[in-house]
Regions:
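Acidic, surface-exposed loops and disordered segments
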Residues: 1-103
């Protein structure tokens, strides 16, 4: 990306997100972070690593534990990456026709 395009994009996006309500920005952050997390997990798997997304943790303590700015960063999930010791097992999934309505 040429530098001038980058600068124009950053300026436009900064102005756009500054106008949005905090909740709208938070929802955008959560969606984007979920997509980035998914891509990281797929990339790790492609390189022979296993991953485990973790959502059950004390989000209010994350900034202090990791030494990051609480007002700037939104905790989304913890993600462990490594080599598994044991083979995983398949979990049950409902058939799509049991959980989806097509209208």
């Amino acid at each position: 990306m040429p530098q001038e395009v980058k600068e124009r994009q950053v300026q436009a996006l900064t102005a756009h997100f500054a106008k949005l309500p905090a909740q709208d920005n938070r929802e955008t952050i959560l969606i984007d972070a979920g997509l980035v997390s998914m891509q990281l997990m797929l990339t790790a798997r492609a390189h022979g690593y296993d991953t485990n997304p973790i959502g059950g943790y004390e989000k209010e303590n994350m900034a202090e534990v990791f030494g990051i700015e609480k007002e700037r960063y939104v905790p989304v999930m913890l993600l462990s990456i490594g080599k598994s010791v044991d083979e995983g097992y398949a979990s049950y999934r409902f058939p799509i026709d049991k959980i989806t309505q097509w209208k």
